[in-house]
């Protein structure tokens, strides 16, 4: 068994850990970092297609906010979470995508005036919608096997 820390290692937010066991790669959380755009680059530090399953511990953005980026980068497997977390993610991820798109449009307009290059949104509403289709609600008890 191997545990890799891809987020919340140097800072408190941005929880993202990969557990490798029995030839399977399970991602535990995939969160946004708080503290500015520099922490939320458009790339992941691992191959999204190599992940077999995702478990989201809870709906806070620093534990779930990069799920649409994971899907945008090719992840197509299940995303396990409690029903309550799934319900919140349906609202939060779509809202976050709208904010990402709006921020990218604002920055593009600003950068066009100054001659700086434009940046793409971290992810789009369609990426969030695609992510929601992968949610698999699980019910406690906590001993549920995935």
Regions found by a protein language model. Name each.
Residues 127-141:
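Eukaryotic helix-linker segments that join adjacent hydrophobic helices
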Residues 9-11, 21-77, 81-85, 92-130:
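Pre-active-site segment of Zn-dependent metallo-hydrolases
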Residues 2, 16-21, 137-146:
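Catalytic core of the metallo-beta-lactamase
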Residues 1-14:
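N-terminal metal-binding scaffold of metallo-dependent hydrolase/deaminase domains
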């Amino acid at each position: 068994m191997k545990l890799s820390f891809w987020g919340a290692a140097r800072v408190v937010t941005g929880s993202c850990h990969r557990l490798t066991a029995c030839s399977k790669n399970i991602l535990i959380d995939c969160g946004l970092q708080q503290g500015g755009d520099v922490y939320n680059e458009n790339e992941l530090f691992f191959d999204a297609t190599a992940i077999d399953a995702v478990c989201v511990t809870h709906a806070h953005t620093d534990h779930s906010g990069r799920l649409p980026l994971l899907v945008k980068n090719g992840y197509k497997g299940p995303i396990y979470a409690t029903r309550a977390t799934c319900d919140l993610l349906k609202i939060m991820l779509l809202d976050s995508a709208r904010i990402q798109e709006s921020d990218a449009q604002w920055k593009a307009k600003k950068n066009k005036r100054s001659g700086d290059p434009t940046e793409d949104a971290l992810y789009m509403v369609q990426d969030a919608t695609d992510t929601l289709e992968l949610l698999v609600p699980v019910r406690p008890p906590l001993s549920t096997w995935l």
